[in-house]
Amino acid sequence: MKFGMGSAQACPCQVPRAASTTWVPCQICGPRERHGPRTPGGQLPGARRGPGPRRPAPLPARPPGALGSVLRPLRARPGCRPRRPHPAARCLPLRPHRPTRRHRRPGGFPLAWGSPQPAPRPAPGRSSALALAGGAAPGVARAQRPGGSGGRSHPGGPGSPRGGGTVGPGDRGPAAADGGRPQRTVRAAETRGAAAAPPLTLEGPVQSHHGTPALTQGPQSPRDGAQLGACTRPVDVRDSGGRPLPPPDTLASAGDFLCTM
């Protein structure tokens, strides 16, 4: 079959081949085809007339609206060289620029790099009541800091050789409301006061301090919420002296007054 130059078959992929060759769908005409049918408005901006390689239409440099920052990384970048990371990421400072401008309380230890570390925490096996109260064990001399009697060693703090003095009640927040003592000493004093208070008498079912259900109540019917393993024998609390029960693991080890269900 022969076609003239003014034929309606403009796309070369629509031209019928010879019967001996197999038809290969190389470029099928579609709505984004570069050399599609010559219909008004069918060509996209930047379309090519020849059968060259297909490339997408050029996008604007920055699409208007909020989606501009989202669509911009999706564009194909020219393959001249791989993009290097931001140069500011390789120029990070080795230390903070203004270590003394941190928002810190005057009584705290300095946060500048190279300052002495705070005192280590006491061992978990020993009692930390003496450490919290600020006292020393009997027979052990307490080490004096260079800032004076118990003062801070950094300049500007209370008790330091360069001054600093006492801090007003409005400068340190809730810690200065009690005469400037640190919060740890105040909490230790409150703990000692709570330990000296007489114990409360037990009324009603005994309940341990771990929030376990009452141990004197046996399991009722299944409708009343009986649980498997609940104790059916009453607990003998006459020798406890009205004090709260020990932890559940201690109670479970004593089999004389607790069931082993």
From Swiss-Prot:
GO molecular function annotation: ATPase binding
Induction: Up-regulated by TP53.
Domain of life of the organism encoding this protein: Eukaryota
Residue ranges with Basic residues bias: 74-87, 95-106
Single GO biological process annotation from the record: positive regulation of release of cytochrome c from mitochondria
Positions in coiled-coil regions: none
Composition skew (Pro residues), residue ranges: 53-63
InterPro entries: Bbc3
Annotated stretches, region: Disordered: 27-261
Entry GO terms, CC: mitochondrion
Amino acid composition bias (Low complexity), ranges on this chain: 40-50, 64-73, 124-146, 172-197
Compositional bias (Gly residues): 147-171
Domain statement: Contrary to isoforms 1 and 2, isoforms 3 and 4 do not contain any BH3 motif.
Designated name of the protein: Bcl-2-binding component 3, isoforms 3/4
Source organism: Homo sapiens
Upper classification of the organism: Eukaryota, Metazoa, Chordata, Craniata, Vertebrata
